[in-house]
Regions:
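Acetyl-CoA-dependent GNAT
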Residues: 18-86, 90-92, 103-104, 124
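Conserved hydrophobic/aromatic "anchor" residues
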Residues: 73, 93, 129-130, 135
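Conserved N-terminal entry element of GNAT/NAT acetyltransferase domains
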Residues: 1-19, 159-165
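Conserved catalytic-core motifs of GNAT/GCN5-like acyltransferases
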Residues: 119-121, 131, 136-152
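Conserved GNAT acetyl-CoA-binding A-motif
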Residues: 110-123
């Protein structure tokens, strides 16, 4: 299969486990590196960012694989305010259509969790992707580690019930 055509691929999604916490951090840092952040900034995030075992156990955290090769992960937090807390693809998987497939899976997971809408605090470089998917910008959130404002988005799942008149 040609990996330049993500829409023709079948991805695998497996539950992350506590043994994957370092891997999650590394994927996030490598993904951020794609967007041109300085090595100093990436190292600062690497030293400050930790995924706790409890986070992985309590939330829906899925590793994304293409032909058994890790290409990213996502995390959904169900709570008083439901969130797509993370969606990161490794640089080799960016721009190949995988994001569209992953976002479909995220919506499926949300339906299973009875989530009808969720919020996303987006990296500015990913905001356009979420807007194309139908998310709406509802504000901004200050990020202390990044010392800047990040877009706050809201995505509402489409109902599976269609009324024909």
């Amino acid at each position: 299969m040609n990996s330049d055509f993500g829409e023709n691929k079948v991805l695998q999604f497996i539950d992350a486990e506590s043994k994957h916490t370092g891997l999650l951090r590394d994927v996030l840092i490598l993904s951020k590196g794609y967007w041109g952040y300085s090595q100093e900034q990436l190292e600062q995030w690497r030293s400050n960012l930790k995924f706790e075992d409890e986070y992985v156990a309590r939330n829906t955290v899925k590793l994304i694989l293409d032909e058994s090769e890790l290409i990213g992960f996502f995390a959904i937090v169900k709570g008083d305010i439901d969130e797509l807390d993370h969606l990161w693809l490794l640089p080799k998987a960016i721009g190949k259509g995988f994001g569209n497939l992953v976002f479909e899976k995220i919506q499926s997971e949300c339906k299973i969790l009875n989530i009808t809408e969720f919020y996303i605090t987006s990296d500015p470089d990913a905001e356009g992707f979420y807007l194309k998917k139908g998310a709406l910008k509802v504000g901004e959130v200050y990020s202390e580690p990044q010392k800047r404002m990040l877009p706050k988005l809201k995505f509402t799942l489409k109902s599976t019930i269609e009324i024909h008149t």
